[in-house]
């Protein structure tokens, strides 16, 4: 297939995180153009609006008929496809103050419920990411998020995208994850994270990712090497389970199959799309 790849991955977008992200090698990237890799510094934040901007840029400049969007950030993909509202523009200083306000709350979800029951009803109490985003809007606009979105409605994504997902038998997936984790450790995962953790702020977004956060616990002597490996494997299996459930319940017209079936379906779809 004559295609290019857009990486919708919240870890591969960072420079210097190569092992923890299982990023494509430079050789692989030389043969096939990849977008949205090595774009951010460790102390910068990734989010759905950023990925949407990068995706639209890639679609505009790509010289190929097909652009494959690949990755694990299903929540971002859903946000992009459903449409994003314009978010309030705030300075770096304001962002720091807002972050401090939110972090000082004893119960962020309870506070959100008190100022905007409508928004709180749509968010699970354990969904810390969405709770945080809702409170950011409140503190930056002094308006309940539900009211803000009434005057700043979502802008739907203007391109049609076909969706495909791999279905892998549980034991095979677990074995893949175990082998991937072993490979990461053998390739120097701990050394990679040790260097980055010493160089960047401790609250940097990538330091919360699976594979990274467990390595930090090991470096802080809270985990043994054996427990580190077990924790990465267990947390990755749980993440894969959550992603699978999310994909099945949140996307319409999702084609699911084995590696061979999905490959065949994508090839057929790309041929018909090009002809059309």
Swiss-Prot record:
Its cofactor is Mg(2+). One of its GO terms (molecular function) is tRNA dimethylallyltransferase activity. The record marks 73 as: Interaction with substrate tRNA. Keywords: ATP-binding, Magnesium, Nucleotide-binding, Transferase, tRNA processing. Residues 9-12 are annotated as: Interaction with substrate tRNA. Belongs to the IPP transferase family. Monomer. This is tRNA dimethylallyltransferase.
């Amino acid at each position: 297939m004559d295609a290019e790849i857009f990486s919708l991955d919240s870890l591969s977008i960072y420079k210097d995180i190569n092992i923890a992200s299982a990023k494509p090698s430079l050789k692989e990237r030389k043969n096939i153009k990849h977008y949205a890799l090595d774009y951010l510094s460790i102390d910068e934040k990734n989010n759905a609006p950023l990925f949407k901007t990068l995706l639209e840029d890639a679609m505009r400049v790509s010289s190929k008929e097909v652009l494959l969007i690949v990755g694990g950030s299903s929540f971002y993909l859903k946000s992009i496809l459903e449409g994003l509202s314009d978010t309030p523009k705030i300075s770096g200083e304001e962002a720091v103050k807002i972050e401090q306000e939110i972090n000082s709350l004893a119960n962020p979800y309870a506070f959100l419920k008190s100022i905007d029951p409508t928004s709180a009803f749509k968010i699970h109490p354990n969904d810390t990411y969405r709770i945080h985003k809702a409170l950011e809007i409140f503190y930056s606009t002094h308006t309940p998020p539900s009211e803000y979105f009434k005057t700043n409605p979502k802008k739907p994504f203007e391109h049609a995208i076909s969706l495909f997902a791999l279905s892998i038998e549980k034991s095979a997936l677990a074995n893949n994850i175990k082998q991937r984790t072993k490979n990461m450790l053998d390739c120097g995962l701990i050394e990679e994270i040790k260097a980055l953790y010493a160089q960047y702020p401790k609250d940097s977004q990538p330091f919360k990712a699976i594979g990274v956060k467990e390595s930090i616990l090991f470096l802080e002597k809270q985990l043994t090497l054996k427990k580190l490996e077990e924790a990465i494997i267990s947390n990755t299996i749980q993440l894969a389970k959550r992603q699978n459930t999310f994909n099945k319940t949140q996307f319409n017209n999702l084609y699911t199959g084995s590696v061979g079936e999905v490959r065949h379906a994508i090839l057929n779809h790309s041929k018909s799309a090009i002809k059309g």
